[in-house]
Amino acid sequence: MQDERPVDQLTEAEAAAELARLAEAIEAANTAYHTHDAPQISDADYDALKVRNRAIEEQFPELRRSDSPSDRVGGALAEGFAKVRHDVRMLSLENAFDLAEVEDWIERIRRYLGHVGDLLFTAEPKIDGLSLSLRYEKGRLVQAATRGDGETGENVTENARTIADLPTELDGAPDLLEVRGEVYMSHEDFAALNGRQEAAGQRLFANPRNAAAGSLRQLDPAVTASRPLRFFAYAWGAHSEPLAATQHEAIARLAALGFATNPLTRLCTGPEELLAQHAQIERQRAALGYDIDGVVYKVDDLALQRRLGFRASTPRWAIAHKFAAQLAWTQLEGIDIQVGRTGALSPVARLKPVTVGGVVVANATLHNEDYIAGRDSKGQEIRGGKDIRVGDWVQVYRAGDVIPKVADVDLDRRPEGAAPYRFPETCPECGSEAIREPGDSVRRCTGGLICPAQQVERLKHFVSRAAFDIEGLGAKQVEALWRDGWIRQPADIFELPNRYRDGMQRLENREGWGRKSAENLFAAIEARRRIALHRLIFALGIRHVGETTATLLATHYGSWAAFEAAMTRAEVGAGPEWQDLLSIDGVGAVLATSLVTAFHQEAERAAVDALAAHLTVEDAEVRAPVASPVAGKIVVFTGTLEKMSRAEAKARAEALGAKVSGSVSARTDLVVAGPGAGSKAKQAAALGIETIDEDGWLRLIGDA
């Protein structure tokens, strides 16, 4: 259920449900963008999800999830590459969308530092590509790695060596230097690459960012070498000696070492100069020849950067000031309904083709039934209450080069006789009833596994990169094999070698296949008979269970036998198994109901049992919890802290596993009170909550 009310109007239960929804949506977006190089929502929509998630966490800190999207960077790693642990984490950036948010960021920096003088900042274009870390030892490139999840990336060293403007040897560099930057593809090179792809009958790339990411993450370096990739350096990680004293001097040093750096980088003082540079770069955007989606501001003084440090997933000393979405008007020619793997009926606008930001757009998302009607299930208006009808002139926006969205409708140009759109109440694929649960904005097919669309989409999900990742069995192959009746459920995939290696029907005889490709697929299938528990749970495609949740479940239950037994015995709303499931941080009643219901549906259970018979499931790796006296506790700071700033205290507490709240409640575990502590200290005393001073806090955490 999507709740679009202001955060301060949410109850605690509503906030918890909204955080669960946001975590699922953000995780799905991260997986599509970082792991599959195939983003499914716009940058603007993604940013809105992150902003709302953080706002709810700040309002309800005690509800902050252990798998909070605010703490995550990037997505899951692809199979086929060796893993690389980053010596210095590769983090994402906080976003700003207007001058007020930039000014707020600068003010937060001043408060954190206790700084009242002028601050210098660098401003540079935010390249829309793939982050890459390059490790040089004694001046020689020894390792290249993608960002991955920020902690661990993929080793793409041999592929990176093929990038023409990336030096493999440095003269005069520190003995150890890790250079970071962005791999991208120019518009001209992207058009030429897609031309070659089309001529060869191969799939076209959606945009330059996808082309760059897909090209760098090729298992065959020869493929990468054939793709025209480029690289801009903008940062550094591990190093044996400092590059310079300031950001702009360090970038100049990288340029002197032979790296391409962005010529539009400028030194600025204060928000007015930053905004002027943002406007200047945005005016030049269309003529740059490569994609950018904003301007990055960084504190120039590296000593101040070190003092400011980091939050869980972003540096305090940098922010990305994003560009507004690109807009165009066109006519809505029709509305098509697509059915997803969970049965969701998703409306898609069929548009008269229009150019938006240099790309021809013919389709756009309409989200759901309420979005078309202009009013949600609670009667609140969407777009001022204007509904969308076939024949309307609609405003389309596109941000981040992904699926465009219909943003508005021009009622003055509505054709006479245009009828209100009636959303189907039956599934267009199988004819089953399509229902809406109370409060849900999505209508879903009730056909389950008898619905062909759900069968196909769930099979695609099953073989996706974060699930079983069976090499040689992608979405197109799944569709073709399903269409001809060769596979209907996941277990059928593991029967392919037995059924179609020999005999009258052979995989190698199908169009697009041969003996070698068939044997390669059979070998890949055999290799996946052994699977990690979290991958299997995710691969089942149960609604609300994303990658992060699957990992939480795997860690909690430890083995497939324990997980399966618990789900089988559990009853929705009652019993020890149900309570145990709800005890997992990050699992709420909605998610738990979805899990338990799936394991009690006859068709679903039969499909799971048939699949499990083919597999050896590896037990989960159990990690030791953070050893800290405040891990898992809710801490409130009040009054004046004399030995550290409030921001530093909060950062230290969170690093030790505590949750820092801005208000005292019955769930608060500890209050740290300095001079001038007022109502919060009194409230803590009234509730019997332990209260200590700053020295006591430092002794408790071992910093005295």
Swiss-Prot record:
Q: What catalytic activity does the UniProt entry give for this protein?
A: NAD(+) + (deoxyribonucleotide)n-3'-hydroxyl + 5'-phospho-(deoxyribonucleotide)m = (deoxyribonucleotide)n+m + AMP + beta-nicotinamide D-nucleotide
Q: Which Pfam families match?
A: BRCT (PF00533), DNA_ligase_aden (PF01653), DNA_ligase_OB (PF03120), DNA_ligase_ZBD (PF03119), HHH_2 (PF12826)
Q: Which cofactor does it need?
A: Mg(2+); Mn(2+)
- Boundaries of every BRCT domain copy: 625-704
Residues the record lists as binding NAD(+): 43-47, 92-93, 124, 147, 182, 298, 322
Q: Name one GO cellular component term.
A: cytosol
Q: Which GO terms describe its molecular function?
A: DNA ligase (NAD+) activity; metal ion binding
Q: Name one GO biological process term.
A: DNA repair
Keywords, comma-separated and alphabetical = DNA damage, DNA repair, DNA replication, Ligase, Magnesium, Manganese, Metal-binding, NAD, Zinc
Question: Which Gene3D superfamilies does the record match to this protein?
Answer: 5' to 3' exonuclease, C-terminal subdomain, 6.20.10.30, BRCT domain, DNA ligase/mRNA capping enzyme, Helix hairpin bin, Nucleic acid-binding proteins
Superkingdom, taxonomy of origin: Bacteria
Q: Which EC number(s) are documented for this chain?
A: 6.5.1.2
Keyword Nuclease on entry: no
Q: What positions does the entry give for Zn(2+) binding?
A: 427, 430, 445, 451
What is its biological role?
DNA ligase that catalyzes the formation of phosphodiester linkages between 5'-phosphoryl and 3'-hydroxyl groups in double-stranded DNA using NAD as a coenzyme and as the energy source for the reaction. It is essential for DNA replication and repair of damaged DNA.
Question: Could you say which protein family the record assigns here?
Answer: Belongs to the NAD-dependent DNA ligase family. LigA subfamily.
The protein depicted here goes by the name: DNA ligase
Protein's gene: ligA
